Amino acid sequence: MDCYTKYLAENVLSEDKVVTYRYLSRALRVHVNTAKQMLFEFHRSQNAKCPNTVHATYLVYGRKKADAEQPSALKNGDGDIEMTSSPPEAESISEAVPAYSLSLIPEDRLSDALADYDEVFSIHVYSIGPHPNKDVALLADAANATLNLESKGDVTQLRAIINPRARRREQQGAGLRAAAAAATVKSQAKSIFPKPPTAPSTSQVKEAPKASQTVEETAEKATLSAPAKKGSSAPKSAASSGGIMQAFSKAAAVSKAKKQTPALRSATPASVEESIPQPLSDDGEDDEDMPQPKPSRSSAMKTKKQREEELRRMMESDDEEEKKKKKEEEEEEEEEEEESEHEQLPAEEEPMAEEPKAPEPVKEEPAEIITATTNGRRRGKRKVLRKKQIMDEQGYLVTVTEPAWESFSEDEPPPPSKPKATSLAPATQATKPKKGGKGGQGSIMSWFAKK
């Protein structure tokens, strides 16, 4: 029996819990009287090793003394109480009935409490804890823990007294309660509307379906008469346009009437269900006071979330299609550019590129290839690094830089030596006419000297 000492040491000494004899009997699957003895032995052995380490609470059952049962107001002198107008004394019809009391007493007040009892029928350890019991709420929590502890197997083996007619209800969520209530209402509705109509007790039940049928028929007539009136109020020119449009309008009116009739049918059983008295709970209170769940909001939220997810998927699919189209267009443009560049190459260079058969060492490709030069302009292609967005294996877009050929057409850069020669030539040409001018014109003084 060392298992109970380990269990109590872990719960009481290590985890500072209050353990009752009921909780111990259910946890270890032992008789309740055996659990009481276990608590007593553990309390005695632990206090023998270390005093005041474990504190007990006792349950005392017996008959208290007459003086203890009287209220404090009656203990004055002869027991009379001063009143303004005392009623006449009533004669004692029957003998005094003895009163028995059941009380939970801490360990430190046990001797004082036993002095108030005239006769004690039973006394045993109710619970043990690491601290002296000064708050009754701790015992209430321990009792709730006993109820929450699932009892597997037959509880009668523990000598627990159970009412055979009692029904144990498990507290479930609000949604399950609503489903159970709907199931009970449906079963009651089925019992009210039985299939065999020949029974004499179903005379009142027959009137309810008849009333619902009349309501449905009137609704169908109203729905059919409404479009008929609208059609008659329309101008005759529209009616003379053709019989095909009339046939379509009639079909639409019939479909609307069919849609409205199920709504009326679903409304009539709801009214019948409201008239059915719902069963009361075991506490005697009506179950309608309990807050019912509102599935409409949750369903609306679900539909909104579904719509948002569908829109996101549509947008993602559209983006993927656009990216694929862009990639295809870029690839086609690159292929067209390469084909045009190959066509522009001279015919002599093409066979030279195809002729070499022997393997040659790989040479680095030039950064620029000039295909033609005309009128001071040159045309060709050059290597350029371009960025591309590629979908990787995991479905993410990745930007990659790849070398690509780009065609260009630009002016030829002038050679560095020619500009110097051209700059000297006009300088010599400008100096020559200045010398000739000086010899032809002369000065003003020379003109006066000649005269």
UniProtKB/Swiss-Prot annotation:
Keywords: DNA damage, DNA repair, DNA replication, Nucleus
Domain of life the protein comes from: Eukaryota
Subcellular location: Nucleus
Main location: nucleus
Bias type Acidic residues, positions: 329-353
Residue ranges annotated as motif PIP-box: 441-448
Family annotation (InterPro entries): POLD3, POLD3_sf
Any one annotated GO CC term: delta DNA polymerase complex
Compositional bias of kind Polar residues: 200-216
Comp. bias (Basic and acidic residues): 306-316, 354-366
Assembly and oligomerization: Component of the DNA polymerase delta complex which consists of PolD1, PolD2, PolD3 and PolD4, with PolD1 bearing DNA polymerase and 3' to 5' proofreading exonuclease activities. Directly interacts with PCNA.
Record remark: domains: The PIP-box mediates the interaction with PCNA.
Name of the protein this chain belongs to: DNA polymerase delta subunit 3
Organism: Chaetomium thermophilum (strain DSM 1495 / CBS 144.50 / IMI 039719)
Gene designation per UniProt: PolD3
